[in-house]
Amino acid sequence: MIVRLIGIFLLLLNTVEAEELALGASKADAQATVGCLFPMGGRGGIYGQDSVTGIKLAFEHLKKQPLPYPPIRVLVSDSSSKASKAARQVRNFVRKDGVRFICGVVNSAIALQVAEVAEEEKVFFIGTDHASSKLTRGKVRDYYFRVSNNAEQSMQAAAIYIKKKFARGPRAQPLKLAYIGPDYDYGYQAWKDLRARLDAEGVNYQVETVLWPKLYEPDYSAYLRALVDKKVDLVVNALWGGDLVAFIQQANQTTLFEHARFANFDTGGNYEVLSALGEDMPEGLILSSRHHNNWPQTDYNTWFVERFHALTGRYPSYAAEGAYAGILAISEALRVAGPEASDQALRDALSSLHLKLPEDPEGFISFMNPLNHQLQQVIAIGETVPDQRFLPARMMLGNWMIYHPQLSNQPE
């Protein structure tokens, strides 16, 4: 009985600690406070854990810079991947902790709700992971800025890639295309963005089937049968994280990869997926991600990846660099505008942001589009090739095709 009570106490203690994690400056020394929302346990827990390490690396990086940055305090709360909880947490951050910035959020459906609350509370929401283009389309949100690729950008690169790799003349048979994505906003927007970009590029294609498994679907057998039966040329998959891992593991038991090319242009190349699959990752899949551990091969990216590994014993998922970018963006805005600056001054600083990140190749610096508050970044699409430098992954991406941002094609 005593052992059981101790176990319950430790579980509750760990939960409290996870919800009250504080990083950076002390409460007394901080000139600004940031509230970050990430899933810290369950199927999406690796994103939160990696994000926390990314925040720590951001503080390390800032300490090395010649220019002084205002000290900031970062509070990390476990969103549990629940929209209602995340909305309450934002209000608690503002009213209890006096935060001026919210950062993070993995799930796009949750991000949409958090963005609404942030606008109501008049605090800046720096999106670091979610990718629905709905947040940066239409009327600009005064308090929302995103520092990782959105689905619009990924699908723009995807359409150019498809046009080059699967070119079909106007008189040839159209490319037979299938799409499978999660049954919520991110999946819907990715499909909408892909079709819009394929049409804009003049790609001759024909949609054979569109499938919508629910988030965290355990059994993809019915969806796999539908894809195999259609005999398509290209399957575009927009699942992510554990869902994509489960899909590929189950697809390995079918003939899907034998008769169709497979692509995931936004999240498929995430190291989390590559490492989880290990030897089960097939060769020749077309994948991309918001950060790659083996591209670009710059000193900055090497430092980020190796330092992350030194701290954790594993290599980073893209969530780590997203959180890293979020803290750098907030710090840079505070440095430029000042910690006591008005909302408009901070908005101007974020709108004109130029931020050198680990994912930036030589000669390129990520920059904010002031028209929609979406950071503009280079996108690298590759194919899985044998590479055991980043174990437990047995496949990494190679055969790269690189796409620089085309600002004129971004939504206003």
Question: What do these predicted regions represent?
Answer:
Residues 1-33, 412:
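Short, low-complexity disordered leader/linker segments with a strong preference
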Residues 88, 134, 142-253, 294-303:
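Extracellular/periplasmic Venus flytrap/periplasmic-binding protein
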Residues 141, 251-324, 336-338, 395-412:
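Extracellular/periplasmic periplasmic-binding protein-like sensory domains
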Residues 19-34, 65-71, 165-175:
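Immediate post-signal peptide segment of exported/extracytoplasmic ligand-binding proteins
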Residues 310-320, 331-393, 410:
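Segments of small-molecule ligand-sensing domains
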